[in-house]
Amino acid sequence: MAPPQHLCGSHLVDALYLVCGDRGFFYNSGIVEQCCHRPCDKFDLQSYCN
């Protein structure tokens, strides 16, 4: 598994598509705080999947 990393903008959206796939995801300001301002991992991203 990849180490936690900072994901912002299009990198964050691409990572969400990769992790969530066909389930889709919801995007709110909380994920920016969690993954852009601080590093996050795959499990953090999964919490935003539908």
Swiss-Prot record:
* Disulfide cross-links: 8-36, 20-49, 35-40
**According to its record, what are the GO cellular component terms?**
extracellular space
Record key words, sorted: Carbohydrate metabolism, Disulfide bond, Glucose metabolism, Hormone, Secreted
Q: Which Pfam families match?
A: Insulin
Claim: Secreted is one of the keywords in the record = yes
Against SUPFAM superfamilies, the record matches this protein to:
Insulin-like
Which GO biological process entries does UniProt record here? glucose metabolic process
Localization annotation = Secreted
Q: Per its UniProt record, what InterPro entries does this chain match?
A: Insulin (IPR004825), Insulin-like (IPR016179), Insulin-like_sf (IPR036438), Insulin_CS (IPR022353), Insulin_family (IPR022352)
Q: What is this protein called?
A: Insulin 2
Q: Which organism is it from?
A: Batrachoididae sp. (Toadfish)
